[in-house]
């Protein structure tokens, strides 16, 4: 499993100086008045160097123009709150309006518990944005890294036209111990790994980090849709 920051992953995939971040002005607020949440957010900003758990923008990968989003796992475990959901929704809306594909890199523990039902609502919001993008015939490549769990798995992360994962990444909804306790069964050692998901048809391929730039560029080039903007 390869541990990289959100920006490291975008820079690695992108052509030199190609990435332009957008929607960075959207910031978290304590809408439910959860005690200590503002302080927690400030600590996470200082620790991660990011303002939120996801970065979105426009880039090119071997000359192929695309929208991109990437989760920052060191910001509250890459959890999806209202800001992450809003930014993912907006990047898909931008891609749909501008006839661009989307490359998404997920490293998330799931919905952010401090935002309660507002966090869970982001599952529907992001899934709807992906659907509108797909309805226009545009391409979405989803890259699952360790971990991809909970609300991320149950929404946008598993809706790619092509879904790939890094070796040995944990991919699932509930955690292993929860599943074992609820099912009263002993699960296989490879349960919820990328290899398990590939074997059972939930993902399309396993691609090591070092091979992703070539792979993603090839997928973008060979999955162009009619009318797609490559300028």
Predicted regions and their residues:
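Intrinsically disordered, low-complexity segments enriched in small/flexible residues
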Residues: 1-50, 58-61, 219-231
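General structural feature for long, well-ordered alpha-helical segments within catalytic domains
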Residues: 6-9, 40, 84-87, 91, ...
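A structural preference for short, pocket-lining loop segments at secondary-structure junctions
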Residues: 59-72, 87-111
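Glycine-rich phosphate- or other oxyanion-binding loops that anchor nucleotides, phosphorylated ligands
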Residues: 65-67, 80-87, 105, 119-125
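A generic structural signal for short coil/turn motifs at secondary-structure boundaries
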Residues: 76-80, 112-115
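Conserved catalytic cores of soluble enzyme domains
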Residues: 109-224
């Amino acid at each position: 499993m390869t541990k990289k920051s959100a920006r490291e992953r975008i820079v690695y995939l992108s052509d030199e100086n190609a990435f332009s971040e957008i929607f960075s002005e959207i910031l978290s607020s304590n809408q439910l008045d959860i005690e200590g949440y503002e302080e927690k957010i400030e600590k996470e900003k200082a620790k991660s160097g990011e303002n939120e758990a996801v970065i979105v923008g426009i880039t090119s990968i071997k000359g192929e123009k695309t929208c991109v989003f990437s989760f920052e796992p060191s910001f509250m475990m890459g959890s999806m709150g209202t800001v992450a959901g809003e930014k993912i929704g907006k990047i898909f809306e931008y891609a749909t309006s501008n006839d661009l594909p989307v490359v998404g890199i997920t490293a998330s523990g799931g919905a952010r518990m401090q935002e309660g039902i507002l966090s869970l609502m982001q599952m529907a919001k992001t899934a709807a944005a992906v659907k509108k993008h797909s309805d226009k015939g545009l391409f979405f490549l989803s890259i699952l890294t360790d971990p991809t769990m909970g609300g991320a798995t149950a929404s946008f992360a598993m809706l790619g036209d092509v879904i790939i994962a890094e070796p040995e990444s944990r991919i699932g909804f509930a955690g292993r111990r929860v599943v074992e306790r609820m099912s009263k069964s002993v699960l296989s050692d490879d349960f919820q790994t990328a290899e398990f998901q590939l074997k059972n048809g939930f993902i399309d391929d396993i691609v090591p980090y070092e091979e992703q730039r070539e792979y993603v560029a090839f997928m973008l080039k060979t999955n162009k849709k009619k009318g797609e903007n490559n300028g």
